[in-house]
């Protein structure tokens, strides 16, 4: 029972941290537009957001993989 309570408290603290910082964590990605585009899905405290990036395998033009963290446009506390 103690483990469950600690796990729930840890999840709540992470959620509050995401809410106040405005960051999102990568939960999924897929290639689109004949391999030239990369669609990344992020979990934020306010829901999910989807971002499109230019994608190349070499990374010379665009990015190779989605960033693990991404700053959201909507932040609760700008203080």
Curated annotation (Swiss-Prot):
Pfam families (UniProt xref): YobH (PF13996)
Signal peptide positions on this chain: 1-33
Keyword line: Signal
InterPro entries: YobH
Protein name: Uncharacterized protein YobH
Organism of derivation: Escherichia coli (strain K12)
Phylogenetic lineage: Bacteria, Pseudomonadati, Pseudomonadota, Gammaproteobacteria, Enterobacterales
Gene symbol of the encoding locus: yobH
């Amino acid at each position: 029972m103690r483990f469950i309570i600690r796990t729930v408290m840890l999840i709540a603290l992470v959620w509050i941290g995401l809410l106040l910082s405005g960051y999102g964590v990568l939960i999924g990605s897929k290639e689109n537009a004949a391999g030239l585009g990369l669609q990344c899905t992020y979990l934020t405290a306010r829901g999910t957001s989807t971002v499109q990036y230019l994608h190349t395998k070499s990374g010379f033009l665009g990015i190779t993989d989605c960033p693990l963290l991404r700053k959201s446009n909507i932040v609760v506390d700008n203080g």
